[in-house]
Amino acid sequence: MRVAVDTNLLAYAEGVNSAARRAEAQALLLRLPDRSVVVPAQVLGELFRVLTRKAGVSGESARATIMSWADAFEVEGTTPEVLLRAADLAASHRIDIWDAVILSTAASSGCRLLLSEDLQDGFTWGSVTVVNPFAVQLNPLLDAALKHG
């Protein structure tokens, strides 16, 4: 099962927020099979902004960080088709355009899940279901995607 990740999951894994959330995000990412994870390019851009603006990281360090994530997982870019579908999604569901780009990228990449704390948990668009990876109760789809053992 292919799984897309949103900015907040990577930001938490980088230590933005709290040590407890960092450990939780890192543990979750380690349990996802590497070849199943998709990072929309939009997420890397947002992560750069979060690191430089919110976390006070230098531009050079933030660039190195996003390159590390790009090396670790498959990165999918924003095509004109993805952007147009995102605009339709944003207009029809009143979702922020940049969140819609991430969801549209996940759909075009064949992902079944988008792990996000920002979008509505359980929202399904096409074949992609948004799952809050930090929800108290583990979503069955996320559980199925995780490595066990």
Feature annotation, model-predicted:
Residues T7, P80, D99-A100:
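Conserved glycosyltransferase catalytic-site signature
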Residues A41-G45, M67, D71-S92:
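Acidic catalytic patch
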Residues E46-E74:
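Active-site-proximal, substrate-binding regions of enzyme catalytic domains
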